[in-house]
Regions:
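Short, flexible loop/turn elements at secondary-structure junctions
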Residues: 29, 173-176, 261
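A motif-centric feature for acidic-aromatic and gly/ser/thr-rich catalytic loops and repeats
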Residues: 102-186, 193, 219-221
Length: 262
């Protein structure tokens, strides 16, 4: 339970299972969201029956490859994502459109490519013509939103940015949940407001002495699985895989150099 005091106090409720996976969230407005996971702990679905919205997730290893959105039990959009490790390379977004009731619905597809910083965080998306179609809003060092995507130092007076192009990523491996403000980080949930994880590290003390800590510096370090911080992504992935009993990553896996060398 998360409670905020004030003139209009608010209470948010979270439900966790025995594996410390978030299975339910109730907002201060009474919206109930349900989350489902597969046997490997990967999120496969989130839904809100009150809003008649449902998202399904298709995985490629530990990276999300496809997100489908359903509204009123009908497929509304499909987002395909291509990663180099945990760095977004490109995405293809398709949505059904019906400009007029007399016209049959048609699927419209747009392909965009990403530019990321040294940690793999998306900085912008551009189309095949080289025009910027999306960029993130301002955030604090730990990812807390300080502005909307269109409310930045470089405004969008012509309305050229596309909100639907937002891939939904914060830091490497972190997927933003608009309903709760949390970020789904594979094995755990990250809270940008505090810069901490909500549950203890599944690795215990093997992941570090501070089991709720994210990373020392998000500008130099990443934790795409929510297990342990790392500067060399391939080394970190193999270390986490060994501890969890999973298959090791290949030697040419996407690599990020040590933070002190960046």
């Amino acid at each position: 339970t998360k409670h905020r005091d004030g003139y209009r106090p608010e209470t948010e409720r979270f439900r966790w299972d025995s594996r410390d996976q978030l299975t339910g969230y109730c907002s201060a407005q009474g919206e109930l969201w349900e989350y489902r996971h597969d046997a490997s702990g990967r999120r496969t679905e989130k839904r809100c029956d009150r809003k008649k919205i449902r998202f399904t997730y298709l995985w490629d290893g530990d990276s999300i490859a496809e997100i489908r959105e359903y509204r009123d039990d009908e497929l509304y959009s499909v987002r395909h994502l291509v990663f180099n490790g945990f760095e977004l390379i490109s995405q293809q977004f398709s949505r059904v459109r019906q400009p007029h009731p007399s016209v049959a619905p048609q699927w419209v597809t747009r392909t965009n490519h990403a530019v990321s910083d040294l940690t793999g965080r998306p900085l912008m998306l551009f189309n095949s013509e080289g025009k910027t179609v999306w960029r993130p809003g301002q955030t604090s060092l730990w990812g807390l939103a300080l502005s909307l995507p269109a409310d930045t130092d470089d405004p969008d007076p012509r309305g050229e940015l596309d909100p639907e192009a937002d891939p939904g990523l914060l830091y490497a491996g972190q997927w933003r949940d608009a309903e709760s403000g949390l970020c789904y980080n594979r094995f755990r949930y990250y809270e940008p407001e505090s810069g901490m994880y909500l549950v203890s590290d599944p690795l215990g003390l093997q992941g570090g002495e501070q089991t709720y800590r994210y990373v020392p510096n998000p500008l130099r370090w990443i934790d795409p699985l929510g297990l342990n911080k790392g500067a060399s992504l391939s080394k970190m992935m193999n270390s986490s895989s060994d501890l969890m009993g999973l298959r090791r990553q290949p030697q040419n896996f996407w690599r990020l150099y040590r933070g002190k060398d960046i």
